Amino acid sequence: MEVIRYPNSPFKLHQPFPPAGDQPTAIAGLIEGLSDGLAYQTLLGVTGSGKTYTMANVIAQSGRPAIIMAHNKTLAAQLYAEMREFFPENAVEYFVSYYDYYQPEAYVPSRDLFIEKDSAINEHIEQMRLSATKNLMTRDDVIIVATVSAIYGIGDPTEYQQMVLSVKEGDTIEQRDIIATLVSMQYERGDLDFKRGSFRVRGDVIDVYPAESSENALRISLFDDEIDRLDMFDPLSGSLHQRVGRYTVFPSSHYVTPRDTVLRACESIKEELRERIEFFAREQRPVEQQRIEQRTRFDLEMLYEMGFCKGIENYSRHFSGKKEGEPPPTLMDYLPDNAIMFIDESHVTVTQIGGMYKGDASRKQNLVDYGFRLPSARDNRPLKFHEFEKVMPQTVFVSATPAKYEEEHAGQVVEQVVRPTGLVDPQTIIRPVATQVDDLMSEINDRIQKGERVLVTTLTKRMAEQLTDYYSELGIKVRYLHSDIDTVERVEIIRDLRLGLFDVLVGINLLREGLDIPEVSLVAILDADKEGFLRSHRSLIQTIGRAARNVNGVAILYADKITDSMKAAVDETERRREKQIKFNEEHGIVPQQIKKQVKDIIDGVYHEEDSGKGRRQGKNKVKVGEIHNEEDAIKEIAKLEKAMQQAARDLQFEEAAVLRDRISNIKENLLFGAE
């Protein structure tokens, strides 16, 4: 492993091998395009050609902060894991939606049904989001891997930066001032329960567990009103890591705002409320009039007393001081001016970004019309596409099948068709639909004997379920990947396929972009001649490409007629095959099978206990530690809470309840002493 540092670049690239194939020309072309000031470029890279490695080299050579946009959490997690391997010494961050579950606020007029907002926040991802914004403000060597969550409103970066607590050894500051500042930053005082986003006070020592940190806490030791020393320590064991001369504590939420901003926003909300009450009075709608007054006054009371309220994001326009219709502050506002953006699988991601606003707007309109929210709630929204275009830094679209938008906007198209491994695009075979199920059965058996895996894509959920049941009854180890499966479990299924826990994965639209499974040697596309989104030429090229990482890769398209989409997909695949074969012959390359270590691609994104191992290993037995003092008790509580959360995730509710009771007993003994 060679570590490379380019002149004037803060990045240290851990290079497992030098760029090869089309990579050197692609890297040079993109760097030249960035230097020439091209707003948009396209990297047309086939599956398995090392597009991620090319991106890493471009980032390292340019020396500029970067954001990589992906269209789903699975792909984002895969990119994040790879970028961390290339840049272990730099700030590689992960910015996706922190909701494990999210039910937005909504009103259904036909049934007079109001649905309250309900959500479950993944604390670890919330910490990573806060870490991303902190590093954007404090470091130059930052790479953010994000989903469309990046175009949704978060707190204003200017006000967020105003709310930091900067401490330095030798500073004169009273203990009560530090505590007051931490409370205003929405840190909780938890002398017993020391967790992320909290602080505790012990004599002249204040321990702060920064909201954006997963493993380090800050100890502020005071001597009278002077900061005597600052130490980083392990919040679980209490062991000191290092002494630091200065430290900046960032707020525990992106929505923290200074007190004077809150008061100004409250006055603005009152004015809008008055106008809305008058509107409903004129329209003779007393129910809506009373509803909006009651709900908004309750929120105002909370804002005056606490500085925040439930659903505070709906008042974001009043806090940011923006005019009606202006775009909300998003992650894009935190990016430095010299940032570069890569949009991975751009043929999907660009369309997805464009569609976010309209779905959100129709739901909000009902809430406004029926008095559940003030009209300003409409400005708590994702960016419209034209607004996103205005804030896009220099951008590289990355795709094997660029769509119309990329074709129209790209200043230059850089091709990366030749794979360094010499692997050739899969051979494409067309067979009749009539015998597709039985024909596929014999193909699957051939692959199983060779220790290879198979992906099967169908058109409907019902067909996928029936096919899975049928093959399962015949003794084939088969799983079905569908849209109801959450992100973590989806990653687990893909990992289990690679490990050989099953041999065949059936899906509908989930087997296309970005799935990196070198063990797959056969992709079967059922009903390939049914024209539509799932069988467009781009979809077919992407699906065929899933077998391109295997030296024996084959794609079978079951069809009774050859559609225009099929012809375009097969022709493009053949063009790429010929180019690769020619390259291999010229350079004497024998195609080599990719041997990629099987590990959890979300390693570092979700905790180890999230990886679903409990589901396969049965209940988690937790050894009870001996408790001699308060420090032992705090360690034991932290360990038991982890086990309790895992048991709940594994639906082992009785075990979770036992662990909860054990935690309660330890806390009671701490408070009142052992009986």
Curated annotation (Swiss-Prot):
Question: Which molecular-function annotation in GO is an example for this chain?
Answer: ATP binding
One of the protein's GO biological processes: SOS response
Q: What is its main location?
A: cytoplasm
InterPro entries noted in UniProt: Helicase/UvrB_N (IPR006935), Helicase_ATP-bd (IPR014001), Helicase_C-like (IPR001650), P-loop_NTPase (IPR027417), UVR_dom (IPR001943), UVR_dom_sf (IPR036876), UvrB (IPR004807), UvrB_inter (IPR041471)
List the transmembrane segments.
none
User: Its GO CC terms?
Assistant: cytoplasm; excinuclease repair complex
Instruction: Indicate what this protein is called per its UniProt record.
Output: UvrABC system protein B
Say which species the protein is native to: Neisseria gonorrhoeae (strain ATCC 700825 / FA 1090)
